[in-house]
Structure formats: structure tokens, C-alpha cells
Design a protein with these regions (language model features):
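Charged helix-capping and loop-helix junction motifs
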Residues: 147-151
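Conserved small/polar residues in nucleotide/adenosyl-binding loops
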Residues: 154-159
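Flexible, glycine- and charge-enriched loops at secondary-structure boundaries
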Residues: 32, 142, 146
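Short secondary-structure boundary/capping segments within folded domains
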Residues: 45-48, 84-85, 160
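Conserved N-terminal subdomain of the carbohydrate kinase-like
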Residues: 52-137, 142
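Glycine-rich phosphate/adenosyl-contacting loop at the front of the ribokinase-like
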Residues: 1-78, 117-119
């Protein structure tokens, strides 16, 4: 890969951030929704630094999914490979924050929309301008998303292939 776009595949979710630090989940009075998910965060950070990034995933066709899409688009991320589905909801992660900064997560994603993203939704031609593919291990569970990752790894053009074709 020697193009100019960072591609990231995997989860985008809503982190439910507690209004109070240092207490257990059952003691938290309220939570605030924030866009999260490591692959989405990597795209956002790279775009904010002036890079070109594209996000591949699937969100629920629900208010949280549309909130995530609006916020990622506002960062300047290419969302042309983002899908929506009514077959599952957008993933949620409730976060507990300790005084020392450590975190505990409780995930709601059985299955979530991102895990249903499948190889059939990917066109290898998208990656002609890719310089890197980022992904995280969370999406490698036995799901259609796992096979979408494998599809990318086996079909994305490598720098050696590009040099041979010149």
C-alpha cells in the first residue's frame, strides 16, 4: 500500500460516559453519549491532523448510528464505505471511570450492526489509494466482520504488486 488514504475497518460505537468518577455502575446518576470505537477514533485523529482517512463499518439505522455518522463526517472522514442496517443496533459501551483513571466497560453488542458488516459489502478497488489499513482485535470475533477483515487482508494490493505492474 503506497497511496495517501488511511483506511480503518471495525467498530464505531457510543461510549456512555458517567457523570461521576470513582463509583460503580449502579451508583452513577447519569451517562452522556460520546462517539467512540478505536477504528473510528484512529480515522478521526488522522483526519484532524490533516490526513485523508476512510472508515469501513456498519451502524444501526438508529439515532446513535446517525449521531456517529454526523460526528465522523464533521471530522472530514470519508464515509462512502459506511453502511446502515435495520438488522441490529449500534453498539453501546457503558464506561465506569475510577479516580486513578482506570476504566471498566460493559458492552451491548450481541450482535451489533458493525459485527454484521460482511465481505460482500467490500470492493477491493476501493483500496487503490490506500497507504495503510488499521483494524482492532475486537472485530475479529467469529462474525461477518471477521471475514470482512480477512477479505481486505487477502485482496488489498501490496506495494510489491504495484511495483510489478509498472
Amino acid at each position: 500500500m503506497s497511496g495517501s488514504t488511511l483506511f480503518s475497518i471495525g467498530e464505531a460505537l457510543i461510549d456512555m460516559i458517567p457523570s461521576r468518577v470513582g463509583c460503580s455502575f449502579d451508583e452513577v446518576p447519569s451517562f452522556s453519549p460520546r462517539t467512540g470505537g478505536a477504528p473510528a477514533n484512529v480515522c478521526a485523529a488522522f483526519a484532524r491532523l490533516g490526513g485523508k482517512s476512510a472508515f469501513l463499518s456498519q451502524l444501526g439505522d438508529d439515532p446513535f448510528g446517525h449521531k456517529i455518522a454526523r460526528e465522523l463526517e464533521a471530522c472530514g472522514i470519508d464515509l462512502s464505505h459506511l453502511a446502515f442496517t435495520d438488522k441490529a443496533n449500534t453498539a453501546l459501551a457503558f464506561v465506569s471511570l475510577e479516580e486513578d483513571g482506570s476504566r471498566t466497560f460493559s458492552f451491548y453488542r450481541k450482535p451489533s450492526a458493525d459485527l454484521l458488516y460482511s465481505p460482500e459489502q467490500i470492493d477491493p478497488a476501493w483500496f487503490a489509494d490506500a497507504f495503510a489499513l488499521h483494524y482492532c482485535s475486537v472485530s475479529l470475533v467469529d462474525s461477518p466482520m471477521r471475514y470482512a477483515h480477512l477479505c481486505l487482508l487477502y485482496t488489498s494490493p501490496s506495494p510489491r504488486d504495484r511495483q510489478k505492474s509498472r
